[in-house]
């Protein structure tokens, strides 16, 4: 793997917990791409005067619904000991908010964004900027390019590294942006600047890596032909929104497709860099209200026979019944086993899957699984176990590429 491991960090609580618990030596060899997102919805927010929930479109134009400021502050504070990281804004509508929409406005050369980035650097953060491409609906081509160039110019005067991230499977016209900036990019690089193009594949379904790799290799050839040997990051995730989208109800195993995608691209373009989402799916489930409980599940990322993720999951068992009163009527309700019983059970199954299970040294996530199997379940929250998976994933990726400092 060329240079550091680039980690897209989407600033959810589970991701911040994983990052805090990742060994500091491992954090030192990871380059985060911090994608600022909306944060949690504030209590009783997101409703109109009649108490009716706002539509998705209304949410994006209503300020004060989400705790955006608190989220970006805590996310950037978590990065304070990084040697450097890229700062970006979310492109996922479900993770955006009115504050993000305003911050990413293209007016006056993305003035609000450039000011925000420079202000954060004044606070001592070793951040590097990512170019935004978010033209107003009524912008013509000249205005589009003018604002993009002004943004690049502002950043090039204050930074030696600049990134451009594109949803490569969706935007087939992004080369227009790069060609529009070619004189500026060339001048920046001639003066010692480093320009990174992050090809974000977002979610790549396990088994589809080869198809994406062939297309991406062609895209990279086009980039090199126009801009020379700029620095390209191949970024993706293959962890599904729901494990049952790719596997069985209780147990399955699937390939870490982003590794396969990267290795296929590297066969023809040896200088590309690796990036992933730390096993996080691009779509977040934090606004789903769980009324019927959930099935305890623990995931493990293995380096056996390449990189794979496997999971064990259990439906809670009925251990008795009790009488309850519902709207004045007596009914019999099942009593289910405690979540901790099932987390202990699935942790034991995770550790018992030979030869895929391997002890990961100096890993908080691995320690949490061992503790749970022994009866000391750290948490019954699904968010906690997402953090466990993410911390193990990062550790195993570093080991897989031979750059684990531990």
Residue ranges, per PLM feature:
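Eukaryote-skewed repeat-based solenoidal scaffolds used as protein-protein interaction platforms
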Residues: 113-293
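Alpha/beta catalytic barrel-like cores
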Residues: 1-127, 135, 234, 241-406
């Amino acid at each position: 793997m060329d240079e550091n491991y680039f980690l897209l960090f989407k600033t959810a609580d589970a991701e911040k917990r994983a990052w805090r618990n990742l060994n500091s030596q491992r954090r030192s060899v990871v380059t985060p791409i911090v994608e600022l997102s909306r944060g949690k919805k504030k209590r009783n927010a997101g409703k109109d005067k009649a108490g009716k929930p706002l539509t998705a479109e209304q949410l994006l134009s209503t300020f004060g619904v989400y705790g955006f400021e608190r989220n970006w502050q805590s996310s950037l504070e978590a990065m304070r000991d990084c040697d450097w990281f890229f700062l970006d804004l979310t492109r996922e509508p479900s993770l955006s908010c009115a504050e993000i929409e305003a911050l990413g406005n293209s007016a006056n050369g993305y003035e609000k964004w450039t000011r925000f980035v420079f202000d954060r650097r004044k606070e001592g953060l070793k951040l590097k900027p990512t170019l935004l491409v978010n033209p107003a609906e009524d912008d013509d081509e000249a205005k589009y390019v003018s604002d993009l160039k002004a943004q690049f110019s502002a950043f090039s005067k204050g930074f030696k590294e600049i990134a451009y991230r594109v949803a490569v499977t969706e935007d087939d016209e992004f080369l227009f942006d790069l060609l529009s900036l070619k004189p500026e990019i060339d001048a920046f690089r001639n003066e010692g600047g480093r320009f990174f193009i992050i090809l974000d594949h977002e979610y790549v379904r396990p088994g589809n890596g080869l198809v994406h790799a062939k297309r991406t290799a062609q895209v990279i050839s086009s980039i090199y032909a126009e801009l020379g040997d700029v620095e390209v990051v191949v970024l993706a995730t293959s962890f599904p929104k729901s494990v049952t989208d790719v596997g069985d109800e209780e147990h399955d195993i699937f390939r870490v497709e982003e590794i396969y995608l990267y290795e296929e691209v590297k066969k023809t373009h040896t200088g590309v860099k690796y990036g992933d989402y730390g096993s996080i799916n691009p779509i977040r489930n934090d606004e789903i209200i769980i009324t019927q409980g959930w099935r305890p599940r623990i995931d493990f990322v293995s380096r056996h026979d390449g990189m794979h993720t496997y999971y064990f999951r259990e439906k809670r068992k009925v251990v008795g019944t009790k009488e309850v009163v519902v709207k004045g009527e007596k009914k019999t309700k099942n009593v289910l086993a405690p979540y901790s019983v099932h987390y202990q059970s699935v942790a034991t199954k995770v550790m018992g899957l030979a030869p895929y299970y391997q002890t990961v040294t100096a890993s908080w996530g691995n320690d949490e699984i061992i503790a749970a199997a022994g009866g000391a379940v750290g948490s019954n929250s699904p968010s906690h176990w997402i953090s466990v998976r993410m911390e193990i994933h990062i550790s195993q990726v570093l080991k897989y590429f031979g750059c684990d400092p531990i």
